Every structure is written in C-alpha cells, then in structure tokens.
C-alpha cells in the first residue's frame, strides 16, 4: 500500500501502527524493513517517513552539540500550550499517543544517530533545544531565595508529588510561571508501567519543576512586595545567618585534611551547634516568608494557573481558584 497509494496508507496508519511498531520492537530484521515505510505523525495530522521527518527538522531542531531533537506530545489538547509555544519557535511537534510509543521513543533514540526525543512539556521552550549557553536568572542569590520560598510555601500537598522551585529569565512577554517534568524521570516511570524489573521507578514520587519567569512583571511585583513587606523581620535573621555561615566556613577550613580523630571534640561540637543554629534560622526565615505568602493572592493564583494548565487542579482547590479569580476580577 505504501508504494502504490501513499494517501491510503496514511489513512490506515493509525490502525496499522500498533502492529508495525510491535514488530519493530520485537524483531530486528523487521525493523530493518519497516523503517523505510513506518510513519511519524505530527500534531497537525501530517505523516512523514523517518527519513522525511529528519529532513524536515534538521535545520531548526539541531542543538548546539549537534544532536537532532525530536519534540513530541502525548496529548494534543492537554499539552496544547506547550505545543503552541514550540510551534511559535518554528519547531515541529510529533504526536506520540500510542500504546507502544513510550517503548518506541526509547528504541528510536538508540537507532537514530545523534538524536534525542524530548517531550514538549519537559522544560521551558528555550531549553528544549539548547542553541546557546543558558542565560542565568538576573537575580541575586538572596532574591532567588525569597522568590523560591514564598512560592514553595504555597504549593499544595499532593500524594506522591514533589515540586522543585527554580527561577529563569524567559523574557518579559514569556509566561510568568509554568510546570515542567524531567524527561528522564517521567520516561522511567512510564517504562515501569510496561516493563518488568523497573517497579522501583514506579514507586517514586512524580517530580515537577515550578519555573518562575523573573522577567515577568507579576513575578517582579511579588518579589518587590515580599522584599518590602518582610525586610524588617528578615534583617536580624539574615545578619545572624551571615555570622553563622562565616563561622561554619572557618571551622570547615580548620578541619580540612584532618582525620576524624585528629579534630578536637570541642570543634566537632561547635560545628554541629553552628549547623543546628543555621537550620533554625532558615526555618525562621521561611516562616516569615510563608506567612507573607499566605496573604498574597497573586502567588496562589499564579501557582493555580500553572497547575490548571497541567490538569493538576481539582476538587476544592479548583473551586477556591474560581472564587479567587472572581474576587480578583
């Protein structure tokens, strides 16, 4: 059919795909034959052979290290905003929503030379295909800590879900906040569902990144307001932490190159005491920022928008979001 009627073959591909992919996954000799006619489907419902697709994306989707990046989505509607952002950068996105596509992605990465498959929601758009060295967020360490703390304090508690908060410079017109999930960890968990011996990954919590765009006016507004509102309460805490960190570094330096039995017990005890005091001061700092964040509706609204975009806002949290949205309007 492929040779005689390409259009008909494309129309039948979605039905044939699972059988052809299964054959390619289980029989090496079948892969050698099928890779000439097997198709990839993009989010615009266009079909390409492997060779055709490689030619389509090689100019625009090759990273700075020479790797060809195949972007893909697993659900066109749920991942629409990420797909749209990729298209706006001139990228093409594959639709890999089949039953065997998780395994196919891993196999094709091994078969295709210098190629990598990356799900479109696994990182911010500027890092999906690294064209140049990453631009660090234009904030001081203290400012990043404040932003991370206020947003982390308002993240919901979800079963087997963990969030890491990070700051990035994504431009003034970029989205203020978004959630991404590591390609590696997500794929390992998906493989655990279909492959024996990988149950360890299946038991691990889902790890997500909450990315704050420090260039966006709303994030800047939160930072400025938090800085001004908490300044008086934080100053004595930060002064104490600076003093403790200095002493901590001095003790560490004094112990460098020494064996455990060569370090006086008094120094060991002091180092332990300093570390405990540092942890206590950090807890105080986070409590101050958490109390501020609890009264800032913009922070909770931004977090809920990111959760909503990823279909992670449900039940009471969704109802509260709707009520808060009406209040803010």
Locate each region found by the language model:
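Conserved GHKL (Bergerat-fold) ATPase module
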Residues: 1-329
């Amino acid at each position: 059919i492929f040779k005689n009627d390409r259009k008909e073959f494309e129309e039948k591909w979605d039905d044939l795909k699972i059988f052809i992919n299964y054959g390619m996954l289980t029989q090496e000799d079948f892969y050698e034959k099928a890779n000439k006619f097997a198709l990839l489907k993009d989010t615009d419902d266009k079909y390409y052979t492997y060779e055709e697709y490689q030619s389509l994306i090689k100019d625009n989707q090759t990273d700075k290290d020479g790797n060809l990046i195949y972007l893909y989505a697993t659900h066109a509607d749920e991942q629409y905003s990420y797909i749209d952002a990729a298209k706006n950068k001139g990228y093409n996105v594959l639709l890999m929503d089949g039953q065997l596509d998780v395994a196919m992605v891993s196999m094709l990465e091994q078969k295709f030379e210098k190629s990598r498959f990356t799900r479109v929601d696994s990182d911010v758009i500027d890092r999906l295909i690294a064209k140049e060295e990453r631009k660090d967020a234009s904030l001081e360490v203290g400012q990043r800590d404040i932003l991370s703390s206020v947003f982390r304090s308002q993240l919901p508690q979800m079963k087997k879900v963990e969030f890491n908060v990070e700051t990035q410079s994504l431009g003034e017109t970029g989205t203020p906040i978004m959630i991404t999930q590591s390609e590696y960890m997500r794929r390992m968990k998906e493989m655990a569902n279909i492959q024996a011996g990988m149950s360890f990954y299946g038991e691990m919590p889902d790890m997500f990144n909450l990315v704050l765009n420090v260039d966006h006016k709303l994030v800047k507004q939160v930072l400025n307001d938090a800085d001004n509102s908490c300044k008086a309460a934080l100053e004595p805490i930060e002064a104490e932490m600076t003093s403790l960190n200095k002493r901590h570094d001095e003790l560490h330096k004094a112990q460098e190159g020494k064996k455990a039995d060569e370090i006086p017990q008094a120094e060991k005890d002091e180092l332990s005491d300093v570390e405990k005091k540092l942890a206590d001061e950090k807890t105080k700092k986070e409590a101050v920022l958490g109390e501020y964040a609890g009264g800032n509706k913009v922070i909770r609204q931004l977090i809920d928008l990111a959760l909503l975009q990823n279909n992670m806002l449900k039940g009471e949290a969704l109802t509260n979001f709707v009520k808060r949205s009406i209040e803010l309007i």
